[in-house]
């Protein structure tokens, strides 16, 4: 009898707690529809069920806010201004948003759980962002760990981007086996040496990542990307490989890919100042876009130089393109520094790290480096070294433009 009584009492307690939780939820959580008012514009506003993240709500209503990390809260790009209804800012947002910005209502859309009516402000350019289903034209190795992905935009459509901008690529759940990658013989040495073909990438949920475009606006009908495969570092060999880079490397001509855009803020200033471009690795992409745009579309007469760092001759690409630009434009010069030239390279050019080469062979004798505009994109260590070097030369922040894809 005591056992039965105990079971009955326990059941009643569980039922009572369940009722209390459901009652509290009904009072505290809005499970009905809410209204998101945007820029005080009725045509841009919408009604939706409560409970989803603001980033997802906006996307489902055709408003695509940049989020390079796919909504994970790590990139800090999906900034919106909330005027009313957003609740308190979360600790996960404070590493990307200053106290002053927080007071002004700045939030990360991927971290805002919409429970009540919202009033928000978005930049007008966001409403020009669209989605396209593109077709893979080609996906070829340009270096040992870098592929050039060329996508065809649907006929009649235009992606209205500016040089230095980026798009986002979407990937559905998938499994990629590195053993299936088509890596040309000339690049297979390091792949075999580090046993990279053993890896697999298993992705169980939709993923979004951002990539800078390598083409410039007058290369119509295509999107051109330089994508470095993100293999696990040697110190952590069992870490999972990069989700999106693995997916992109698996793409073949004819495959369909969903992109959204354009996005960006890594744009050239409209001045007459000298432009110095500094790149490394897959950071080539926005460098190519900018330099082609300046010389081919704008026919700029500004003094322009490009300093690119690579490991060996095998890792250099677009060499003929930049040689031709240099031959056709007296105001443009480009330079490569190899950090580890191989005997077969027969290299007679600059050697070492690109920031040292730039300093020793140009900037240390420059009459006014602080008056130049510096545009850079490369691995985080390169970016940090270049920025320190520029600061030591007295270059102000306003003249240092960084596409921080690896930060």
From Swiss-Prot:
Q: What does this protein do?
A: NQR complex catalyzes the reduction of ubiquinone-1 to ubiquinol by two successive reactions, coupled with the transport of Na(+) ions from the cytoplasm to the periplasm. The first step is catalyzed by NqrF, which accepts electrons from NADH and reduces ubiquinone-1 to ubisemiquinone by a one-electron transfer pathway.
Q: What is its main location?
A: membrane
Q: How does it sit in the membrane?
A: Single-pass membrane protein
The organism that produces this protein has a lineage beginning with:
Bacteria, Pseudomonadati, Pseudomonadota, Gammaproteobacteria, Enterobacterales
HAMAP family, from UniProt? NqrF
> Which cellular components does GO assign to this protein?
plasma membrane
The protein depicted here goes by the name Na(+)-translocating NADH-quinone reductase subunit F
Alphabetical list of Pfam families matching this protein = FAD_binding_6 (PF00970), Fer2 (PF00111), NAD_binding_1 (PF00175)
- Give cofactor(s), names only: [2Fe-2S] cluster; FAD
GO BP terms: namely:
sodium ion transport
InterPro entries according to UniProt: 2Fe-2S_ferredoxin-like_sf, 2Fe-2S_ferredoxin-type, Beta-grasp_dom_sf, Cbr1-like_FAD-bd_dom, FAD-bd_FR_type, Flavoprot_Pyr_Nucl_cyt_Rdtase, FNR_nucleotide-bd, NqrF
Domain FAD-binding FR-type positions: 129-269
* Record note on cofactor: Binds 1 [2Fe-2S] cluster.
